[in-house]
């Protein structure tokens, strides 16, 4: 706990200096359970589980079966308490407030044994007037109630009709009635995560004292005025006025780099607390706009806002302001029924390339700045430009959005409602209104957020009737849906933020959904809006099973994390694919079988006698399968951006499910818990490259498309090669040296019947050869070599067990792995166990005899440590 001038990291790591003191209560507290049998120190911000683990009272909650073993923690009622002395003279201040930025979730707050308020929503801040109860020495208690028990009680109180789903599927081993509490919906379990319905003070808590007035919030929105062809900034500030009299003053906004300074007179009263300003940017000053990654710079300008009020009060806020426009284009497409669905940033159509973000941990106090920055570096390194913040988790911390702004990562922001129906009692709706207002005001100044989405999959849940509600009752549920997402959430968003689009759900049909009364007849329509698509039964190498939709905001396949990640939370008896641990960790129904089903279509399952080797090989094959499946699907979406075929196409976004993991378990993630890259993430780095050749077959003809995110046409050379599996030396090459890849398009550059291709390369059959192809570009432009399999690899002939030798050397902070192979090696996987870092490439088809790969460590390591931990695997090693 410490005293400081008020410094709030509310927007863009901005600072706000106030004449009154701000005293942080973060730091060391005490926490005790319901019957008082446990009492221990606890850190705030933090969680009960974290405190128990830190003091050795429980193991790692993620170890083996501890999600079940420690269920008692979430069922108990815990109390956080602290005592503190006010380090300033209370008599000098008219008003004193106790402010919580986040309480998780249901608690009664006692200040000096006086109840000053209650909390029931994890997603909003709370402010309490303690002027009349604060003393020089004070006690503060938060008496938490079990979120599980609270949700059950709220559900039981809703007696008029059921609000499904009552409980999660049994595979998830979770708790019931999560839709009755405003808390991270995945905290009660999900099909990729555990049930840890935690309790704690998860964000900052502080005391603020002031005279005259206090700045409660401040937002700013740059808006481009088409009529005047100039930028304006809409600024809105809200004050708590302590004085009974009106308070006059001035506000000055300055942006030195844009030669902008504007001063306005203002007047505040207790009933008139809002200040609205329109700051006009000079037309003769060039404004550099903010661009998504890969399309330009993320230029921002330092802005100061100074409120000089009567009585000598000065409140200054410094922030970074970014200028950009966003449009969601829904209009007719020639040759296709329906409407387009794509985004324009600063007037330029942008293909969304990225993934879906889930909470990085069940316990947010573990998501440190370093950990967050490491995850974002992996996003950037994989050539992504978009993250969808999924609606079953949390509105992310301020640093998350600041990083998105700085790095050019667009954000598709869901509101936190997912895969469920929700009650619409007055109390629930009032809490949601506070939540939505709070979050929109907190986040709307971030240029990275390009769209608000009301929920995850709740429109389709009603349209398809996921929860088997009686058709006679469907109107009640539809009315509840419209009440919550349209009449409340949408109404608030449109009132608070007109700068970006809002859709009621994802997936949705956009404008078509509105026309159909907000529940579309077919939310999965590929002619409108966005879709979510999953298919675990059909062959994922067959691109024809995938929908040629306008934008695909979810799609994916599962895999297992690496053995080095699992080893930390398991014991030797767990190391088998069908062990009790493996079955327990799989929360998706039939998930383990579905992975093997896909693997068996194209690969041979391990047949070894060593159980541990078999387990490791199976893990490897699930990662190969996942990477190859999502490569095939993503490349289909990428090459569909510029074409309409049979009325389908104009795909302008591919966000695979999912980016990150919440714990160590099989999931759809490309990044394991702890940040290690799965094979899929290396594939994503390649298939999201700014210039990519994409190959596929249709009716016996082999095609190569050129897919470009570049802003200019690119003149290059395309080389197509055939290789025999037994030798890295290419059998033949076809070269076209006059290729033009169109800017921002996907176009056919090469086509040839496979039979003709094989004729030109004597000695090749579908089973004995593989195709590679690449653009010849300068070193500054990343354009990877791609490949196409002419048969399933389980049918490949001449595929030898490659002897791959490796020599490791060090150059500065980077390590060089020089590889040499005796034969073409599919899916070469370099692994250094638990040593944190990533390779420049991995999981690749090694078609050259020699290859150098770089390793970038995330922490200091040595050549000897790498040599000891290193292993290399290719496909034939699993036979």
From Swiss-Prot:
<feature type="disulfide bond">
    <location>
        <begin position="764"/>
        <end position="769"/>
    </location>
</feature>
<comment type="similarity">
    <text>Belongs to the glycosyl hydrolase 2 family.</text>
</comment>
<dbReference type="InterPro" id="IPR054593">
    <property type="entry name" value="Beta-mannosidase-like_N2"/>
</dbReference>
<feature type="glycosylation site" description="N-linked (GlcNAc...) asparagine">
    <location>
        <position position="89"/>
    </location>
</feature>
<comment type="subunit">
    <text>Monomer.</text>
</comment>
<dbReference type="InterPro" id="IPR050887">
    <property type="entry name" value="Beta-mannosidase_GH2"/>
</dbReference>
<comment type="function">
    <text>Exoglycosidase that cleaves the single beta-linked mannose residue from the non-reducing end of all N-linked glycoprotein oligosaccharides.</text>
</comment>
<dbReference type="InterPro" id="IPR017853">
    <property type="entry name" value="Glycoside_hydrolase_SF"/>
</dbReference>
<dbReference type="GO" id="GO:0006516">
    <property type="term" value="P:glycoprotein catabolic process"/>
</dbReference>
<feature type="glycosylation site" description="N-linked (GlcNAc...) asparagine">
    <location>
        <position position="736"/>
    </location>
</feature>
<feature type="glycosylation site" description="N-linked (GlcNAc...) asparagine">
    <location>
        <position position="807"/>
    </location>
</feature>
<dbReference type="InterPro" id="IPR041625">
    <property type="entry name" value="Beta-mannosidase_Ig"/>
</dbReference>
<keyword id="KW-0325">Glycoprotein</keyword>
<feature type="glycosylation site" description="N-linked (GlcNAc...) asparagine">
    <location>
        <position position="302"/>
    </location>
</feature>
<comment type="pathway">
    <text>Glycan metabolism; N-glycan degradation.</text>
</comment>
<protein>
    <recommendedName>
        <fullName>Beta-mannosidase</fullName>
        <ecNumber>3.2.1.25</ecNumber>
    </recommendedName>
</protein>
<feature type="glycosylation site" description="N-linked (GlcNAc...) asparagine">
    <location>
        <position position="226"/>
    </location>
</feature>
<dbReference type="GO" id="GO:0004567">
    <property type="term" value="F:beta-mannosidase activity"/>
</dbReference>
<feature type="active site" description="Nucleophile">
    <location>
        <position position="554"/>
    </location>
</feature>
<keyword id="KW-0458">Lysosome</keyword>
<dbReference type="InterPro" id="IPR041447">
    <property type="entry name" value="Mannosidase_ig"/>
</dbReference>
<feature type="disulfide bond">
    <location>
        <begin position="540"/>
        <end position="629"/>
    </location>
</feature>
<feature type="active site" description="Proton donor">
    <location>
        <position position="457"/>
    </location>
</feature>
<dbReference type="Pfam" id="PF17786">
    <property type="entry name" value="Mannosidase_ig"/>
</dbReference>
<feature type="signal peptide">
    <location>
        <begin position="1"/>
        <end position="19"/>
    </location>
</feature>
<feature type="glycosylation site" description="N-linked (GlcNAc...) asparagine">
    <location>
        <position position="297"/>
    </location>
</feature>
<dbReference type="GO" id="GO:0009313">
    <property type="term" value="P:oligosaccharide catabolic process"/>
</dbReference>
<dbReference type="InterPro" id="IPR008979">
    <property type="entry name" value="Galactose-bd-like_sf"/>
</dbReference>
<keyword id="KW-0378">Hydrolase</keyword>
<feature type="binding site">
    <location>
        <begin position="190"/>
        <end position="192"/>
    </location>
    <ligand>
        <name>substrate</name>
    </ligand>
</feature>
<feature type="disulfide bond">
    <location>
        <begin position="167"/>
        <end position="176"/>
    </location>
</feature>
<dbReference type="GO" id="GO:0005764">
    <property type="term" value="C:lysosome"/>
</dbReference>
<dbReference type="GO" id="GO:0005615">
    <property type="term" value="C:extracellular space"/>
</dbReference>
<dbReference type="InterPro" id="IPR036156">
    <property type="entry name" value="Beta-gal/glucu_dom_sf"/>
</dbReference>
<dbReference type="Pfam" id="PF02836">
    <property type="entry name" value="Glyco_hydro_2_C"/>
</dbReference>
<dbReference type="InterPro" id="IPR006103">
    <property type="entry name" value="Glyco_hydro_2_cat"/>
</dbReference>
<feature type="disulfide bond">
    <location>
        <begin position="732"/>
        <end position="761"/>
    </location>
</feature>
<feature type="glycosylation site" description="N-linked (GlcNAc...) asparagine">
    <location>
        <position position="113"/>
    </location>
</feature>
<dbReference type="GO" id="GO:0016787">
    <property type="term" value="F:hydrolase activity"/>
</dbReference>
<keyword id="KW-0732">Signal</keyword>
<feature type="glycosylation site" description="N-linked (GlcNAc...) asparagine">
    <location>
        <position position="803"/>
    </location>
</feature>
<keyword id="KW-1015">Disulfide bond</keyword>
